[in-house]
Regions:
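Edge beta-strand plus adjacent loop/short-helix module at the start
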Residues: 1-140, 151
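Short acidic/polar inter-strand loop motif in beta-rich domains
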Residues: 153-159
Length: 159
């Protein structure tokens, strides 16, 4: 039996994070909107949808080397962690709204993302009755970019 001893000096984490170059909204060639909601008069927890579509063909086809803004409009009383595959994005802002006469009506200005949401993401929390905007640069992948809610029951039912 052998015994090995090592001297380990823990290194404290850096107090300075690597800077992240912010993507600029002016560089976005496309803005897309995704409405998150539960369809009325359906099974209790099974019909959460994006843009009222389920099990449909591909509806978004970002072009390689382009920048896009995606707005997640959460019309539900439930937070949705929206996840995008094969691309990282930055959170831009959130804007509260009410639904008046079936229309989304902002109730205040867009609020810039908090510091803890700085940096690159692949999942963003979309809170109830808020528009959450993210910006992404579609580089390095010529295939499809799947996206979905990361709540398992919602994901399984095509949200």
């Amino acid at each position: 039996m052998a015994r090995t001893e090592m001297s380990v000096r823990p290194t404290p984490p850096s107090s300075v994070l690597r800077p992240v170059t912010a993507l600029q909204p002016a560089d976005a060639s496309v803005t897309r909107e995704f409405t998150l909601r539960k369809l009325p008069n359906t099974c209790p927890d099974s019909m959460w949808m994006i843009n009222d579509l389920g099990w449909d063909d591909i509806t978004e086809r970002p072009r390689l080397e382009t920048t896009e803004i995606w707005s997640f409009i959460n019309k539900s009383g439930f937070s949705h962690p929206m996840h995008m595959h094969l691309v990282q994005f930055q959170v831009l802002d959130r804007q509260p709204f009410e639904i008046i006469g079936g229309q989304v009506v902002p109730t205040g200005p867009a609020v810039p993302r908090p510091a803890e949401e700085g940096g690159w993401k692949d999942t963003v929390r979309c809170d109830p009755f808020e528009i959450t905007r993210v910006i992404a640069r579609f580089d390095g992948w010529t295939g499809l970019y799947p996206y979905h809610c990361h709540v398992l029951e919602h994901e399984d039912n095509e949200m």
